[in-house]
């Protein structure tokens, strides 16, 4: 099918890129005031001590490896996540890079994954790929469930956002291994590296990666291309080895001893189906999510047209059911391990994947309708479409309506909750001086700590933070010196005790 004109979709795609880039400016500016907290200190103590004593990158990496070994035996098996957590940017005084790292990881992995699907497999036009990618990223960044743990607190984001991004890269590489002949050796090597990283990361991402590996093999055999599954065998074996090393770490048993109430396997699975509906449908699907869906529809329609009759879309209900099962499975590890549905950092990656599954199901259902409509066209002798749907007057009116709806929804949410959108929250913190005040308090704290390091004091009193910006503040030390956060900070700075005192 040839398309005569697609200027409008190109302009819209360019506008979305501009909007996304501009929306990040306040986010990165407020991120410059970021400061380590809680587990940032505990997991990076060895690395920080090594850097302060030697200023050697190699010795710092060795410190991170020592942390991996200690935690693997004593607390948790997620070795690849621990390695990253042990190298938090605050070691080098660059904690302000955290939002660049996290948003960059989400953006690059999403772009690579959607480019693989839309350009390499479906053969959609670049403007369609860019438009869909920007809509996804805009909604992901602005409406993340827990923005602090997603983009600003390194320890939480490194454990979930970075493995999620690695898993997207891994999925895209596996698809390219199956569909393209070029660069197979390079892609296989990179897929194996990423498979090890994902297998050694958080259990939510690792479990879904295992499900997708099995699904891919099953689909290949179903379409009688089982011989291609050997291309995925090596990455899967690397993933499996890493996952087993992760799951059977002695530290996991130590940590489980602290979990008093834990449901069994079957109850955890059943609860997962319940919580999937509660969170994905009831809590997260709001007016902003509806706006995301409405804005996607014209781009998805063009993707469906690009694929044309090369796919039959025979089982929309099966795809819907599969999506529900996979998203439900993402709730299971936390329920089984702790008896709790999980925290914001876990919700973040479930939220990101739910958006991808919404895109998949919308695409599949629209494809099913397209094939039915195509058959009807043939029967009635109607002419084939010859231009992008964005050039049609009715679609332009539809997009104008979506834009007005978006402005209304944005204004409503900003009025009711200024922290709902990440950019608005960042602007609020910058304009009110809240971010600068937080930065002044953390700078004062850092000065006191560095002076204590230079003077060799064994104990030090640190004023507790009084300014708590929504995006920047995760937690603080407690009064006295006995809380685990105080002990982590003391270990990080090689002190016998850090006392939190009222300012």
Q: What feature does the model see in each segment?
A:
Residues 307, 314-320, 368-417:
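Signature aromatic-anchored transmembrane alpha helix within multi-pass, membrane-resident enzymes
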Residues 101-126, 130-131, 136, 169:
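Transmembrane-helix motifs of polytopic, lipid-linked glycan transferases
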Residues 1-25:
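Start-transfer (signal-anchor) and selected internal transmembrane alpha helices
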Residues 106-117, 166-178, 211-218, 293-300, ...:
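Transmembrane alpha-helical segments
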